[in-house]
Amino acid sequence: MGSGFGGSVAALRLAEKGYRVTVVEAGRSWRPEDFATSAWQARHLLWAPWLGWRGIARLRVRRRLVALTGVGVGGGSLVYAGVHHRPDGAVFREACWDPTLDWESELAPAYALAERILGTTRVPRQAAGDDVLRRTAAALGVPGAVHAARVGIHFGPAGRTVPDPFFDGRGPARAGCTECGRCTLGCRVGAKNSLDHNYLHLAQRAGAEIRPLTEARKLVPQPDGTWHVHTRHGTGITRTRTVLSAHQVVLAAGAWGTAELLHRSQPYLPHLSAALGTRTRTNREVFAAVSADGFDVGPGVAISSVLRPRSDLLVQLCRLGPGTHPAALLARPGGSSWRDFGRRTAVLLAMEQGDSHLTSHYRRGSLTFRPGGPHPEPVRLASAEAVAHDYALRIDGRAALLWNTVLRLPVTAHLLGGCPIGSRPATSVADLYHRVHGYPSLHVIDASAVPGNLGVNPALTVTALAERACATWPAADRPDQRPAQGEPYRRVRGDLSGTAQGA
């Protein structure tokens, strides 16, 4: 269920192991030329099928949360900036990560494999906006804290299409990045290493079937041990309903979609952990716009530089791309004109470690949220605002928080948790092999399984967790080496070489 960073890994690795794999994806499939040319093209950017919009991003506004999530074949990779950073090691030593494992060392080989398949590299060129971030760091007393971002983007000759440069000819042809800055609108060049260019492409070569515009609505276990997955195909008034039968089900619809599907299926899952919905997190994100008349952030990818003033805080320089932008409706800090807002505006995205969280509930057909503990998800981060205001000083501009202060709600593009992994059913939804407690043939392999805030963009970590989970699966014709649920954890040595299918 889902074709994002968890579902795409599962599709490839399980197809390689001899399973018959079907991927169900609520959104449509995309070609580079189908993506929006401007952020004003809502029907190509936003997912609102009741309006006829079938874009790559779904915006959900609730009483305590605003979340932006990806939709389409490739999931969040269609709308993400392509950033691949590993969390600070201290993240994995927080209490929310099950102490049974040394997570930093456990995930190290999975991170390395994920970086190879996703084509992780350093941004090779910097522009004026990046230089301002370096000067800001120096003014804050951390001159060595700015680095080029690590991203999954092909930096070949700009705009030139070449045969597959990543998988010995098994992947699709690719074009070099033109540094237009529109990565988050969907890459029209074909340079961003979205999942349709790697994991999903290889999964289809291995025999996996992908069904776009098909939404999973309900999971029902059967007496013979199989599952019935009730789906709905299409986005119009007339939709086709189909029931799929499977021996194993992987939930990978993202932190929102997976939690919502399990909440909706709860009447049929009496043994489901009461921890469902807990530890839902925003990654503690805040967005600030810094703009000035006469300033030009310069060409580049959507996120080109990162500043780490403290080990628990990351601030990233983001571009909107040239032209006007809907963000101007919420923040016009450097003058009254909306003209060319994207060119003269740097957006600073801050992420902070910390144990704040929400709990999701299912009400009237959708998720609602309540505080999950004494520490609320932040609307503002003083340390991030200090960076934004100092950046503004360097360009004689002004800084303004974007969505957070206007909506007075936590805003995230990286929703995490809700189905956390752990060894105890009382505090986790799935075990350390990602099998749902009480239902060992049901698996959670996506951002919903992440038990804590990461303080960095989560795509690489979700991919690494998925690689680790799938490596422990047996081949279709081999016995399962994982211990039965209820037995003590035992490390299962899986293959993380990624040699199958050239990946």
Segment roles from a protein language model:
Residues 149, 180-183, 220-221, 379-452:
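A glycine-rich dinucleotide-binding beta-alpha-beta segment and adjacent secondary-structure elements
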Residues 11-16, 199-204, 234-243, 421, ...:
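A short acidic-Thr-Gly-centered motif at the start of a beta-strand
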Residues 61, 76, 80, 92, ...:
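FAD cofactor-binding and catalytic pocket of flavoenzymes
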Residues 16, 20, 27-32, 37, ...:
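Glycine-rich loop(s) and the adjacent beta-strand/alpha-helix scaffold that form part
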Residues 1-95, 99-101, 105, 231, ...:
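N-terminal glycine-rich phosphate/pyrophosphate-binding loop and immediately adjacent elements
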Residues 53-69, 239-246, 309, 404, ...:
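Short, hydrophobic/aliphatic alpha-helical segments
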